[in-house]
């Protein structure tokens, strides 16, 4: 940063410019491509009024400088000045410092923080009004945005319909349009970049008639071979694949630390919160049964060590951040003894118990209608002094992905300074996908023999609902069934208001014209109490036998956008069929209160329809279209590939829905945004300016329930800016005047409050140390492995788990930020005649004794598995997965 102290000789060419003029220009657009801000650049050459876009678009500002030889340009979002000729940042106030300044300028300089050797940021408070009011002020100007078709590039109607449905989900689209600087990834195929470009094209002011989503389609095909070729694909499967990839590319580690020792113990027992989005997305019917041969605790311990990498936290850092982690906790924590007493009274209180699980940040993947559950509780033996749910605790991970080895070998050496032996924790992630689409369901099963209740918290991204037939509808609508459901605390309330007259009218109508199926019917069928008997008996962990049971579930947390998938396709062994039953659905006011768990933190349970994907044709062939409500003019449009046509609400309601997107409806959220806009208009000068997360600000603009303010997406655990984010910090934050910050903080809580940005020296030092460690380990391994490759007949060969080695390789190649845990050979080891040998077909590699001792001295772990010269050939090869690790370890 030393170059910043040097004056730029080109400052003399700057014309007379005022802050008000720059702010006025920031509301404009690029003079060449008409793209709007943020991050437009204005030329400062005397007499030149050019405004152009930056690198996030076509970079017309740079082209203008090259054509005109104008040197200086100013970013209209941050008011930072760049000289193209000097290739450095310069400061206008250096040029003006010798001139007398007015009181107004002095006040302005007082309000703005100075740039020092550590990073500080200049963001004018007036820009915030543009960031907050885009939906309110620009509605008339932008009313034609979003009506762009997508060209069919080879039987891709399924993709086009899905993309149009997502495009008309304001929280997601505004993220990519307003927070484009957050869409950063080093992962291939960088689908988030392709999606961001596509959204920019679709919602451009000067939109074309249609665009061709070639880049995004190529990216999807590269990660999922299912979508290669030209056969018909499923729009719902495409949605899951796309959002899963977007999550993986955009996910950020959540900065979480222990509040105290007791909390730390509980978190060690419970493991860390992990969004379902960290794995493949699954709907609520995508679970599978588990094998009960092993104990629940063993399965859980293996799952707790799964996934990306294990994080290693410094205890001092943990203690230093206790206070602002407390601010992040929701204020709805319940007293455990209170709901243990309620739990003994009726089955419904098991949902309250699951709330305790939620507060300990336990999230698991969904398994609908499966007979495997966690957190077993005996209703007759519940003590009041503890919570068995927390002690048993656990999470269940159900995925179609192959199981990953994860158990940590604990018998390793401790090497101070290199690999502390304390228990490592899983990383916790979130992304814009998880923030918008993730919800939570509480599933409970009661054994009718011993009264033990099993409770599971399950995270879902979409609800896959069955379409009930005539007999199912009769059962759902029957008065007797209503009573049993209401008593059981299930979803019978959805039908409770229906009287006998209405019931008979509905019955006779269905007799002549067939049953009328509503979306509420599908929801009621999904959440209805399920009797587990006959071939579907419940395997009780306490009884150790198959028993009759009762299962029911409710929603603990509703997502901001609820994706509902109607199961229209049935795939049999030899053929597939499609259910063509019309399902009526509301355009506004979908009330989900009957399906909400007791004491759920969700305040808003009413949803309005955003978009619906429809399929015309049969199970083997057909065509997808989408009906979407434009958020700017509230009109409905049909998106049929590159054709976009306005339609009536009646046309939408008569559609054969396949996938529906509902958004939380909240007048209060709109009032809050208007209040903040009014505060901006009456803004008073303040001595302090506060920085707020641009990502949270997007939630405030588009979410019905934005939740507490979270500034941790641009801060490290020490309260500074992580070095890797320093170069683009202006994309992560917005500056607020004090009165706006005070209002938002008092209304939503959270934090921490930030009025000064600086690069964290501690993180910088740690980063330099970790780079030295990477270099040392990598160079040593290459040297030792090269000697091993040159050795003709080694006396002993050591085996190492390739799963662990890949994690280590990712660390030394800087693909992963944290080192792996202890060496874990448990998955490749087998006991034979009292000795540990290599398991047949194990995913293992071969290394020399020196290499093993080197890695083991740093990371510890085991067990030690060796191959000697006197073993048989078959035993030494160990299976197809064994390999000698190449010296270059995949082109280092």
Curated annotation (Swiss-Prot):
It is found in: Cytoplasm, Perinuclear region; Cytoplasm, Cytoskeleton, Microtubule organizing center, Centrosome. Its main location: cytoplasm. Residues 272-283, 291-302 have a biased composition (Basic and acidic residues). Zn(2+) 2 binds at residues 30, 33, 53, 60. GO terms for molecular function: cysteine-type deubiquitinase activity; cysteine-type endopeptidase activity; zinc ion binding. It is an enzyme of class 3 (hydrolase). Zn(2+) 3 binds at residues 43, 48, 64, 70. Keywords: Cytoplasm, Cytoskeleton, Endocytosis, Hydrolase, Metal-binding, Protease, Repeat, Thiol protease, Ubl conjugation pathway, Zinc, Zinc-finger. The active site is at residues 157, 623. It catalyses: Thiol-dependent hydrolysis of ester, thioester, amide, peptide and isopeptide bonds formed by the C-terminal Gly of ubiquitin (a 76-residue protein attached to proteins as an intracellular targeting signal). One of its GO terms (cellular component) is centrosome. Residues 148-665 form the USP domain. Residues 667-760, 768-871 form the DUSP domain. A zinc finger (UBP-type) spans 6-109. Pfam families: DUSP (PF06337), UCH (PF00443), zf-UBP (PF02148). GO terms for biological process: axon guidance; cell migration; centrosome duplication; endocytosis; protein deubiquitination; protein K48-linked deubiquitination; protein K63-linked deubiquitination; proteolysis. Zn(2+) 1 binds at residues 8, 10, 83, 86. Residues 268-311 are annotated as: Disordered. InterPro entries: DUSP-like_sf (IPR035927), Papain-like_cys_pep_sf (IPR038765), Pept_C19_DUSP (IPR006615), Peptidase_C19_UCH (IPR001394), Ub_carboxyl-term_hydrolase (IPR050185), USP_CS (IPR018200), USP_dom (IPR028889), Znf_RING/FYVE/PHD (IPR013083). Deubiquitinating enzyme involved in various processes such as centrosome duplication, cellular migration and beta-2 adrenergic receptor/ADRB2 recycling. Involved in regulation of centrosome duplication by mediating deubiquitination of ccp110 in S and G2/M phase, leading to stabilize ccp110 during the period which centrioles duplicate and elongate. Involved in cell migration via its interaction with intracellular domain of robo1, leading to regulate the Slit signaling. Belongs to the peptidase C19 family. USP20/USP33 subfamily. The UBP-type zinc finger binds 3 zinc ions. However, it does not bind ubiquitin, probably because the conserved Arg in position 55 is replaced by a Glu residue. This is Ubiquitin carboxyl-terminal hydrolase 33. It comes from Xenopus tropicalis. The lineage of its organism: Eukaryota, Metazoa, Chordata, Craniata, Vertebrata.
């Amino acid at each position: 940063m030393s170059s910043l102290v040097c004056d730029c000789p080109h400052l003399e060419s700057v014309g007379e410019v005022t802050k008000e003029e720059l702010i006025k220009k920031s509301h404009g657009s690029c003079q060449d491509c008409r793209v709007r801000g943020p991050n437009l650049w204005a030329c400062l050459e005397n007499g030149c009024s050019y405004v152009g876009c930056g690198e996030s678009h076509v970079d017309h500002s740079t082209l203008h400088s090259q054509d005109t030889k104008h040197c200086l340009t100013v970013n209209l979002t941050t008011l930072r000045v760049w000289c193209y000729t000097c290739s450095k940042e310069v400061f206008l106030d250096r040029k003006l410092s010798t001139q007398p300044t007015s009181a107004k300028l002095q006040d302005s300089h007082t309000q703005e923080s100075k740039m020092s050797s550590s990073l500080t940021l200049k963001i004018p408070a007036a820009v915030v009004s543009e960031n907050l009011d885009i939906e309110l002020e620009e509605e008339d100007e932008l009313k034609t945005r979003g009506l762009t078709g997508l060209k069919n590039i080879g039987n891709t109607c399924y993709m086009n319909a899905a993309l149009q449905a997502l495009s008309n989900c304001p929280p997601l689209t505004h993220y990519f349009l307003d927070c484009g600087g957050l869409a950063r990834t080093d992962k291939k195929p960088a689908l988030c970049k392709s999606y961001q470009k596509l959204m920019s094209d679709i919602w451009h002011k000067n939109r074309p008639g249609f665009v061709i989503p070639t880049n995004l389609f190529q990216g999807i095909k590269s990660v999922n071979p299912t979508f290669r070729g030209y056969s018909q694909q499923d729009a719902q499967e495409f949605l899951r694949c796309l959002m899963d990839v977007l999550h993986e590319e955009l996910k950020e580690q959540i900065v979480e630390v222990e509040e105290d020792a007791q909390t730390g113990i509980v978190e060690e027992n419970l493991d860390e919160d992990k969004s379902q989005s960290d794995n493949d997305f699954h709907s609520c019917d995508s679970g599978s049964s588990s094998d009960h041969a092993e104990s629940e605790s063993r399965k859980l311990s293996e799952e707790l060590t799964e996934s990306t990498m294990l994080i290693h936290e410094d205890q001092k850092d943990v203690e230093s951040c206790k206070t602002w982690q407390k601010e992040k906790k929701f204020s709805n924590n319940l007293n455990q003894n209170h709901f243990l007493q309620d739990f003994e009274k009726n089955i419904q209180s098991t949902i309250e118990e699951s709330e305790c699980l939620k507060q300990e940040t336990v999230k698991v993947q969904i398994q609908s209608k499966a007979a495997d559950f966690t957190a077993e509780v005996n209703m007759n033996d519940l003590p009041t002094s503890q919570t068995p749910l927390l002690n048993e605790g656990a999470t269940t991970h159900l995925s179609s992905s192959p199981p990953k080895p994860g158990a940590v070998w604990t018998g390793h050496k401790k090497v101070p300074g290199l690999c502390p032996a304390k228990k490592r924790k899983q990383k916790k992630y979130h992304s814009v996908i998880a923030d918008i689409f993730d919800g939570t369901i509480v599933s409970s099963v009661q054994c009718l023999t011993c009264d033990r209740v099993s409770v599971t918290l399950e995270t879902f991204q979409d609800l896959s609902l069955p379409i009930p037939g005539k007999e199912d509808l009769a059962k759902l609508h029957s008065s007797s069934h209503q009573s049993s459901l209401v008593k059981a605390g299930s979803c019978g309330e959805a039908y409770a208001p229906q009287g006998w007259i209405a019931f008979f009218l509905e019955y006779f109508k269905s007799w002549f014209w067939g049953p009328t199926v509503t979306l509420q019917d599908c929801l009621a069928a999904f959440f209805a109490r399920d009797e587990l008997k006959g071939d579907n008996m419940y395997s009780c962990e306490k009884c150790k036998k198959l028993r009759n049971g009762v299962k029911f579930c409710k929603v603990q947390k509703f997502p901001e956008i609820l994706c509902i998938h109607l199961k229209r396709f049935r795939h049999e062994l030899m053929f597939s069929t499609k259910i063509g039953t019309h399902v009526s659905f509301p355009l506004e006011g979908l009330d989900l209160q009957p399906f909400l768990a007791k004491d759920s933190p969700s305040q808003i349970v009413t949803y309005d329809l955003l978009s619906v994907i429809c399929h015309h044709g049969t199970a083997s062939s057909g065509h997808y279209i989408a009906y979407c409500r434009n958020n700017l003019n509230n009109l409905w449009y049909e998106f049929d590939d590159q054709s976009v046509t306005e339609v009536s609400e009646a046309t939408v309601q008569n559609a054969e829905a396949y996938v529906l997107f509902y958004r939380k409806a909240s007048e209060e959220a709109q009032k809050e945004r208007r209040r903040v806009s009014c505060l901006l208009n009456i803004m008073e000068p303040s001595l302090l300016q506060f920085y707020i997360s641009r990502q949270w600000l997007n939630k405030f603009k588009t979410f019905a329930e934005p939740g507490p303010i979270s500034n941790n997406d641009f801060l490290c655990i020490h309260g500074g800016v992580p070095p890797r984010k320093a170069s683009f910090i202006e994309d992560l934050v917005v500056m607020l005047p004090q009165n706006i910050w005070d209002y938002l903080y008092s209304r939503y809580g959270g934090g921490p409050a930030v009025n000064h940005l600086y690069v964290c020296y501690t993180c910088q030092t740690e980063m330099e140390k970790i780079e030295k460690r990477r270099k040392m380990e990598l160079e040593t391994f290459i040297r030792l492995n090269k000697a091993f490759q040159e050795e003709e007949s080694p006396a002993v060969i050591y085996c190492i788990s390739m799963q662990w080695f890949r994690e280590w390789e990712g660390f030394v190649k800087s693909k992963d930020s944290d080192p792996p845990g202890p060496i874990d050979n448990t998955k490749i080891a087998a006991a034979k005649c009292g000795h540990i040998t290599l398991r047949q077909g194990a995913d293992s590699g071969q290394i020399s004794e020196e290499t093993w001792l080197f890695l083991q001295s740093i990371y510890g772990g085991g067990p030690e598995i060796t191959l000697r010269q006197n073993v048989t050939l078959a035993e030494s090869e160990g299976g197809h997965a064994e390999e000698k690790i190449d010296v270059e370890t995949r082109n280092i």
